[in-house]
Amino acid sequence: MWKDFKEFAMKGNVVDLAVGVIIGGAFGKIVTSLVNDVIMPILGLILGGINFTSAKLTLHGLNSEKPLTLNYGQFIQNILDFLIISFSIFLFIRLINRFKRKEEAVEEAKIPEISREEELLGEIRDLLKEKNK
């Protein structure tokens, strides 16, 4: 049973997926920091000092003691996170596909060289065909 699990865990797809999840988690933190610490303050400065992360709408109900808050600033920030992450992934996949296409084009362009031995075998074949006519 341990051997089967070890074979499963060491297959290329499982290891690649694990590496992708770890890198994705770290990349998510970088993008979140970019949005929180760079983009949102600049956007707030441009729009007159608005801090989007704390932007919210408070609704006071008739019968409730506790007001309801809609944290739309945090929602806007999460949308920016998503857009930056998805665009970055799109660019990365596009770059990978470009390299794959170049490799495929190079492989297609390569014409296999015929060795001297193959040339001689071809000549012998042609001579035998002529002789058997």
UniProtKB/Swiss-Prot annotation:
GO terms for molecular function: mechanosensitive monoatomic ion channel activity. It comes from Hathewaya histolytica. Belongs to the MscL family. This is Large-conductance mechanosensitive channel. It is a multi-pass membrane protein. It is found in: Cell membrane. PANTHER family: LARGE-CONDUCTANCE MECHANOSENSITIVE CHANNEL, MECHANOSENSITIVE CHANNEL MSCL. Keywords: Cell membrane, Ion channel, Ion transport, Membrane, Transmembrane, Transmembrane helix, Transport.
